[in-house]
Amino acid sequence: MIFRQITHDDLGCASYLIGDEDVGVAAVVDPKLEIEEYLTLARYMGVSIEHILETHNHADHVSGHGRLAAATGATIHIHAEAEPEYEHDAFEDGWELELGSVRIRAVHTPGHRPEHTAFALIDSDRGKQPWAVLTGDSLFVGDVARPDLAVDKEEGARGIFRSLHEKLLVLSKQTEIWPGHLGGSLCGGPGMDMKVASTIGFEHQHNELLR
């Protein structure tokens, strides 16, 4: 399995390259505008980027999905509630994408945005349960999502609470969380940590906004 986190220090954002070198396919989650790093990584790993996944429509930066799709011919996937104007494949909660031995499962986590989706990662070589979840803007290291970018702030806050407690915190305590933003990003609060990853168990115990 290929798993790489690509960080963007200027905006405090993170994107991900995921794939299976045995079958030569990969996907990029939440690509930044400058796409050369993904193309270089894919060439080095010997994989073709065939899929682009968006956790949600981003308010803090411009996505590189259009450029990356044009350069690779990859399909852009986003939750149906996003209703973007660009060409895309719309999915619902529970949708899965197979990349050889790797499965990416959509976990609809509305709140920050109505279409917001986390992606659970399953590697059949490691087991049947997710070993990690890409939480996007729903759960950060030491913080949680902002509700003020939702259609309605109060409904957004309720949605975030439900998504955290009914979709994410029910995962195994050992499940790794890899967020869409790191410390310093405007999408989080003062509690957001500079660490690039955490676990469900650690956040459940130490994240003050989950207590």
Task: Describe each region flagged by the PLM.
Residues 1-48, 119-136, 142:
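Conserved beta-strand hairpin/beta-sheet module of binuclear metal-dependent hydrolase folds
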Residues 33-77:
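Active-site metal-binding motif and surrounding structural segment of the metallo-beta-lactamase
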Residues 28-29, 49-58, 76-81, 108-111, ...:
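Active-site neighborhood of phospho(di)ester-bond hydrolases with catalytic His/Asp-centered motifs
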Residues 6, 91, 200:
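Hydrophobic residues at beta-strand termini and immediately following loops
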Residues 2, 25, 65, 69-70, ...:
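Hydrophobic, small-residue-rich alpha-helical packing segments that form membrane-like cores
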